[in-house]
Structures are given as C-alpha cells and as structure tokens.
C-alpha cells in the first residue's frame, strides 16, 4: 500500500527534520512516518531504490540513513521540497507509491 494522499489532513505533525514537517505516528526504528508537506515521502513504505533521486531534475531528495527500519536502512528525504517544480517525475517512477506531491 502506498502513501495516503490525505495524510496532511489525516495525520498529526509530530516533529520537524531538515526544515520539513514529519507526520506521525513515529516509533523508531520501525515507524518513521511521512516526511515533507509539499513533497511527502512515506518512510514506512519507501524501499530506497533511488528512482526518485535519479528522476528529480531539481534535487529535492537526499539520502537519509534509517538503521533498523524493516523496509530499508536509508530513505529518500525531501530536504529541498521547496525547490519542487511539480513535474511529478518522482511520483511516476516510485515502484511502491511512497511519494505524494501537492503544491502549497
């Protein structure tokens, strides 16, 4: 199952990381929540195949280590989400539908 496209309304903001919001629940290392508001990445769905990082023309994502997470031990973190040009390349290439993009 991919990211909940309504997470911005359905989940509570539980923190901030590298300038973007984190939506819970968060219980490390097994549950890491959704990172980002403009470009949201469900860290609990992401398998870190790198397709979004390679597809993004404006370098929205950066690798973030998540040791002990069952899906993968690194994630594509949307640390530069404000640079997003809404081309949807990342959404289209993600094999597990872990990304949701919504203009502010």
Swiss-Prot record:
Check the record and name the Pfam families matching this protein.
Answer: Fer4_10
GO MF annotation: an example: 3 iron, 4 sulfur cluster binding
Q: Which residues bind [3Fe-4S] cluster?
A: 46, 52, 94
- Name the residues that bind Zn(2+): 17, 20, 35, 77
Highest taxon listed in the record's lineage: Archaea
Arranged from A to Z, the UniProt key words for this protein are:
3Fe-4S, 4Fe-4S, Electron transport, Iron, Iron-sulfur, Metal-binding, Repeat, Transport, Zinc
Function in brief: Ferredoxins are iron-sulfur proteins that transfer electrons in a wide variety of metabolic reactions.
Q: Which Gene3D superfamilies match?
A: 3.30.70.20
Q: What name does this protein carry?
A: Zinc-containing ferredoxin-2
User: Any binding details for the cofactor?
Assistant: Binds 1 [3Fe-4S] cluster. Binds 1 [4Fe-4S] cluster.
The 4Fe-4S ferredoxin-type domain sits at 38-66, 75-104
Checking SUPFAM superfamilies in the record gives:
4Fe-4S ferredoxins
User: Which InterPro entries does the UniProt entry name for this protein?
Assistant: 4Fe4S_Fe-S-bd, 4Fe4S_Fe_S_CS, Fd_Zn-bd, Fe-S_Ferredoxin
Instruction: Please give the cofactor(s) recorded in the UniProt entry for this protein.
Output: [3Fe-4S] cluster; [4Fe-4S] cluster; Zn(2+)
